[in-house]
Amino acid sequence: MVFQGFNLVDRLTVMENVQSGRLGYISTWSAITRRYPKQDIRRAYELMERVGIAHYADTRADQLSGGERQRVGVVRALMQEPDILLADEPTASLDPKTSEQIMGLLRDLSRELKLPVLINIHNVNEAKEYTDRIVGMRYGRIIFDDKPDMLDPSAMEAIYAGSPHADRSGGPDDKAAAS
């Protein structure tokens, strides 16, 4: 999972933070002594290179910018070899330019790795620009489920203001929602 607030250990290096994504797969002794399997170190360097932070491998996390910290979080999540990557407000703590870079990175990684990415995000413009599908919910109910270019003002009104407009989900639950 990619967290809104990064959730890095500031006193650890980038590599150590990245390897924390593998803690559930290595022995306690290996974790305590920081003796990570060679294949995990190789994979970490490949991913860090891909997201542009390999040169920070030995840098403490508290020395990084917000965008660099979020990239560490992305690599840590990918080290878990997930079937789906969850991202909770991955751009909330970032400036607009860095937000675009992180959203572009998530989109590109999703396509390259053929990995679904589920992003919880409140920035509608970012959602429209960087995703292939938007699901809008209100009070736990799907109000909209379609391609970004189908998100029009009436759908936005239904999602955010709770207007009585019809459900616009277009998804498999339409019949259940309509009945």
Describe the predicted segments one by one.
Residues 19, 30-55:
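Conserved ABC ATPase "signature" region
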Residues 60-64, 68:
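Conserved ABC ATPase signature
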Residues 81:
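Conserved catalytic motifs of ABC-family nucleotide-binding domains
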Residues 85-88:
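Catalytic Walker B motif of ABC-type/P-loop ATPase nucleotide-binding domains
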Residues 96-98:
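Helix N-cap at the start of a conserved alpha-helix in ABC-type nucleotide-binding domains
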Residues 100-112:
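Helical segment within the ABC ATPase nucleotide-binding domain
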